Design a protein with these regions (language model features):
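Bacterial N-terminal signal peptides
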Residues: 11-21
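Mitochondrial intermembrane space
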Residues: 3-6, 20, 24-184
Length: 184
């Protein structure tokens, strides 16, 4: 496999596994569901690790690394869904990137010399990109929230200005409606 193909493969793996992390942004998880998800991840890890027992040398190491990575990602995703915050989702994406890096690094052990060095550097680059993307996603969400708030404040000021044209009870009613609508 050429370096370019390996790099594309690694990037595809990282993107494929980190993007679903953000898919559950709106859904929460109860405490019992969270506990069950962690238990399920641990059980799946044990089952996957058992399947690695028949392998030898680096193939076994890669298999175990993949099983550990799957467990780490499943637990991180469960925690992110349970906490249901941008920070938790970012942490899950970072955990996924690091787990994928560990697997990729283990796969590089089959190579020798410069090929191995290049493989490790490419794996590290993919990890770094995935972590940067996870952090950027949180920053974008924060900027969008700030923009939403700024727009709401501007709309509130317009509504209050419109209320100034009224007088008495109508003005009070208009102002109260604007305050309720824009949560000011």
């Amino acid at each position: 496999m050429t370096h370019r193909k390996l790099n594309r493969l690694l990037e595809g793996i990282v993107i494929g596994l980190t993007v679903p992390t953000f898919a559950f942004a709106a859904a929460g998880m109860t405490s019992s569901e969270y506990s069950a998800a962690k238990d399920r991840a641990a059980a799946e890890y044990k089952a996957a690790k058992t399947q690695c027992d028949g392998l030898k040398a680096n193939a076994k190491d890669v298999c175990v690394a993949e099983a550990k990575a799957a467990e780490k990602k499943a637990k991180a995703n469960a925690e992110a869904q349970y906490k249901n915050t941008e920070k938790a989702r970012q942490d899950a994406a970072i955990t996924a990137a690091k787990a994928d890096y560990d697997v990729a690094k283990e796969k590089c052990d089959d190579k020798k010399g410069n090929d191995k060095d290049v493989c490790v550097k490419e794996a590290k680059a993919v990890e770094t990109k995935a972590i940067a993307d996870a952090k950027a996603t949180q920053k974008v969400a924060s900027v969008r929230a700030d923009a939403r708030e700024d727009k709401m404040k501007a709309d509130y000021k317009v509504a209050m200005e419109k209320c100034d044209a009224l007088s008495g009870a109508a003005k009070d009613s208009c102002q109260n409606a604007a305050k309720a609508k824009y949560k000011m």
